[in-house]
Amino acid sequence: MGKNEWQGAVQPMALRPERQQVAAPCYRKKDDRKQVLLITSRDTGRWIIPKGWPMEDRSDAKAALQEAWEEAGVTGRLTARKPIGHYRYLKLLKDGSTVPVETDVYPVKVKGLATKYPEAGQRKRKWVSPKKAAEMVQEPQLKELLLSL
């Protein structure tokens, strides 16, 4: 990679400030086996866990729980008030650019799934084993977190 390519493409991205998000890996036990709920992203259709931006009126943990409701219709309870870990990814913005995001992870034990919720019809939901979930997501740090659930 030449100097001009670095200055034009890579350097601005590398120097961009990170943004912070919160995520909620949602899980349940079925037949004595743990399952993780994955959802599709609205823009690319790739498999992810519910996540979003922090909320001024809520703790980060409660914001993660709110995202689980809005994006996946999850009702449940937080199993940690502090993040169990973090993962990084590049968020695709509406203008086509990307921004690095660090995501704090707050697990949610699922009590139920609603059929009517804010983003119903915009995403697919799928229950899978933690191992399968780790295979389906792209972010290496998230893969590790899912395997540790």
Feature roles, as predicted:
Residues 48, 100, 127:
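Short aromatic/basic micro-patch
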Residues 32-75:
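Conserved Nudix-box catalytic region and its N-terminal flanking loop in Nudix hydrolases
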Residues 17-19, 46, 125, 134:
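A residue-level structural signature of the nucleotidyltransferase/glycosyltransferase Rossmann-like core
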Residues 1-31:
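Acidic, metal-coordinating catalytic segment for phosphate/diphosphate chemistry
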Residues 73-114:
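Active-site segment of metal-dependent pyrophosphate-handling enzymes
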Residues 103-147:
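NUDIX/MutT-family hydrolases
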Residues 20, 35, 98-106, 124:
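Short beta-strand micro-motifs in enzyme catalytic cores
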